[in-house]
Design a protein with these regions (language model features):
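Extracellular/periplasmic, surface-exposed regions of secreted and cell-surface proteins
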Residues: 1, 195-204, 209-214, 252-307, ...
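Flexible glycine-/small-residue-rich
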Residues: 4-6, 26, 47-49, 62-64, ...
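Short acidic/polar hinge/loop motifs at secondary-structure boundaries
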Residues: 5-32
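Short, glycine-/polar-rich solvent-exposed loops and beta-turns at beta-strand/coil boundaries
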Residues: 14-17, 34-39, 147, 184-186, ...
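Extracytoplasmic
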Residues: 17-19, 28, 38-42, 55-57, ...
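Non-catalytic regulatory/gating segments with a bias toward low-complexity or hydrophobic composition
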Residues: 22-23, 43-45
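Residues embedded in well-ordered regular secondary structure
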Residues: 51-183, 281-283
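A surface-exposed, glycine/aromatic-enriched loop/edge motif typical of exported proteins
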Residues: 73-122, 213-251, 305-307, 372, ...
Length: 532
């Protein structure tokens, strides 16, 4: 669970320059107050905001970087590969002309000692008098599909204000070329954000934050799976099949990962994320603060990919087409998210006893709509569109909605920084579960003893800053399930393995009611801090 300024959000759409702090809550004792969504822990992100009276400041920074892939898989040398194949399968190889493995190893040794002694064409391809084809050049198929990438980042911000009015405006841009050997591997993101805070009266403050992020990711995508093909042996030639080697494959590109990257069409993914965050703060009494927060977050996802149709050849010398039936795929998804938080905090002391009590209410709702379409057999491959398909047109849509409602509290107790106690609790409900098991209570308690503050440790105070023993216990929920999984539905399942003739479709109840799950954590530890 990722909370950005106390509200769930997408960390990938946040400009790193706008982040003030990041806190990770890993155990149930600290995460229990976040209820049924904190099963995997909580990441708290706080964005930058001016504090107090601030003179006008204009900041600009940039970053230029190069990146290269590391720890690449190591391919076996061709001679070792051929020897292993000979030991396992015999002397006849499976490539064009059924070459002899033993002759290949001999030719390879000769070629290494004197390359001009063997007449090769293209990428080290030798056709013997008996029609068998031997591949002499070795290469790193993984390395051949990669290059050094370049990235540049730019950020600008303006900050200022008085003791009554404060503001911050920022914008950021990142452009990454990617490490694949193509201009189709790119990522770009633009962020703008603004914050304003006004002390309307001594006891009332109004804050407003707005942000907008737009990103575009483009990656080459092959219907054959370029990454999977990196398992090919190191003799696979790059480039195209030379003339005179194979009549069927003459002039066609070889089936290698680098060629697939070059010929494949890019899949394009666009994200737009506008967000508005409003916060009202009231301070009616000393130590007592009431806060009301409202957030609207919209996420727009737009995906498109056209498979294209490419004719290629293989080391067997054949001719093939991928895919045999080209298609255009488009997907759009819209998500509207609303969140309300209302909570109060009271901080007070009774002698040496310090208390901090917080209680509040939270409600969130999300509505998502997805549409997807595939159009087969494009008439104009240079400008593919859903309407220009000459074959099948498929369209589907999905709708998803859920809400969360809960009340929470936290009590902190501190006695002279020696004895520390924290109690948390949240009564949470989620629409993802049946009514009879929709709500759950998730408590936690943690205690600490700072031994360094005891009188018998006074002699260590000049070098020992803290020696704390702590223990905690907590229970958190898990609502990370589909929104309607508790509703029994009839779905279509295709049964394979031949037990139903022709793979006929059968219908069955495929889901069972879900129950809220609870994760328990018991922890203990010690903290030691030295003075220097």
């Amino acid at each position: 669970m990722i909370l950005i300024d106390n509200v769930e959000g997408d960390l990938d759409m946040v400009n790193p320059e706008d982040i003030e702090t990041v806190t990770v809550l890993k155990d149930a004792a600290s995460a229990a107050i976040y209820g049924a969504r904190a099963a995997g822990g909580v990441i708290l992100v706080t964005t930058k905001r001016p504090k107090g009276e601030t003179s006008f400041q204009l900041n600009y920074n940039n970053n230029f970087a190069f990146a290269t892939a590391m720890n690449l898989p190591e391919q076996a040398p061709l001679m070792e590969y051929l020897q292993a194949y000979s030991d396992a399968a015999g002397d006849q190889f499976w490539t064009m002309g059924s070459p002899s493995v033993s002759k290949w190893m001999g030719y390879l040794e000769q070629y290494r000692n004197n390359p001009s002694s063997i007449p090769t064409v293209g990428d080290g391809i030798f056709k013997d008098t008996d029609g068998a084809v031997y591949y002499m050049n070795e290469k790193d198929l993984v390395k051949n599909m990669l290059e050094t990438s370049f990235q540049h980042t730019h950020n600008i911000s303006m900050t200022g204000g008085t003791d009554k009015l404060r503001y911050r405006l920022s914008a950021g841009f990142i452009d990454n070329d990617g490490v694949l050997i193509t201009d189709k591997d790119k990522y770009r993101r633009m962020n703008v954000s603004g914050f304003i805070s006004a002390n309307v009266t001594k006891w009332f403050t109004q804050e407003a934050t707005f942000s907008y992020a737009h990103s575009k990711r483009m990656e080459p995508k092959s219907a054959l799976g370029a990454v999977y093909s990196t398992r090919l042996a190191s003799f696979y030639p790059e480039g195209n099949m030379p003339e005179g080697i194979s009549a069927a494959g003459d002039g066609l590109p070889f089936f290698t990962p680098s060629n697939q990257i070059r010929w494949s069409n890019p899949e394009k993914t666009l994200y737009d994320n506008p967000r508005i965050f409003l916060k009202s703060i009231l301070k009616p009494l000393k130590g007592f603060e009431i806060a009301f927060e409202y957030t609207f977050d919209k996420n727009i996802y737009d995906y498109s990919w056209y498979t294209g149709s490419v004719v290629y050849t293989t080391v067997q010398g054949g001719k093939d087409t991928t895919p045999t039936n080209d298609y255009l795929q488009k997907k759009k998804r819209y998500t509207d998210y609303n969140s309300i938080n209302l909570y109060g905090t009271y901080d007070f002391s009774l002698g040496n006893h310090q208390f901090k009590i917080m209680a509040g209410f939270n409600q969130e709702s999300s509505y998502q709509e997805t549409m997807e379409a595939l159009s087969y057999g494009q008439a104009v491959i240079e400008v593919p569109s859903l309407g220009s398909g000459t074959s099948t047109l498929k369209a589907t849509d999905k709708y998803n909605e859920f809400s969360v409602r809960g009340g929470f509290f936290r009590v902190n107790y501190n006695y002279q920084d020696k004895y520390l106690l924290e109690v948390n609790g949240r009564y949470d409900g989620s629409s993802k579960f049946p009514k009879e098991s929709r709500y759950g209570f998730f408590p936690s308690v943690s205690a600490g003893w700072n031994i360094a503050q005891e009188k018998f440790m006074e002699s260590t105070q000049n070098w020992l800053g803290s020696l704390k023993l702590r223990a905690s216990y907590g229970m958190i929920g898990n609502q990370n399930v589909p929104a309607y999984s508790f509703i029994p539905t009839m779905a279509v399942n295709n049964k394979y393995n031949g037990w139903i003739s022709n793979g006929n479709y059968v219908t069955a109840i495929t889901s069972i009611p879900s129950l809220v799950s609870r994760n328990f954590t018991l922890g203990k530890g010690r903290d030691i801090r030295h003075r220097y």
